[in-house]
């Protein structure tokens, strides 16, 4: 004897499921944007300022890598990585040091020689910004998941 089941509201559930990728994507982008802005703001505050060039270069971007939303925060100036991580001893080029040396009243050659002997000390600004905000980032994505669930429940005629 065949059994026939009739699922009431199946059409609303199917429609909600069809919309779920857009709902999930919208909430992911929202949580990612807020997360990136938190890290970007603290990274900017963490940077020691001379000309503000490094601070002003810190920005964020989002991109898709296949099915994965990727968020990145960082400086657009090349020397940002050297400030974050420091450097081993090396002989640096003169031109990038001239302005700094002049503002600090130090001969460029003396700065070059010091870097050649000792390298430069790391002055992390980005990693501490992430570390400070990682719990808040987890909460932002958890809240996004809750909003997705509530939205899909509403769209399917259920209760969140």
Task: Tell me what each language-model feature is.
Residues 1-160:
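Short, Lys/Arg-rich flexible segments
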């Amino acid at each position: 004897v065949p059994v026939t089941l009739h699922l009431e509201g199946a059409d609303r559930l199917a429609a909600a499921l069809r919309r779920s990728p857009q709902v999930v994507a919208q909430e992911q982008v929202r949580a990612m944007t807020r997360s990136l802005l938190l890290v970007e703001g603290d990274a900017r505050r963490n940077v020691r300022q001379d000309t503000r060039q490094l601070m002003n270069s810190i920005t964020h971007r989002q991109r898709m890598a296949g099915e994965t939303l990727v968020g990145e925060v960082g400086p657009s100036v090349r020397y940002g990585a050297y400030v974050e991580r420091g450097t081993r001893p090396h002989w640096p080029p003169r031109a990038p040091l001239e302005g700094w040396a002049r503002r600090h009243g130090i001969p460029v050659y003396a700065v070059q020689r010091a870097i050649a002997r000792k390298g430069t000390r790391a002055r992390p600004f980005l990693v501490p910004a992430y570390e400070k905000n990682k719990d808040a980032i987890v909460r932002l994505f958890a809240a996004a998941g809750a909003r997705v669930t509530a939205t899909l429940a509403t769209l399917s005629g259920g209760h969140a």
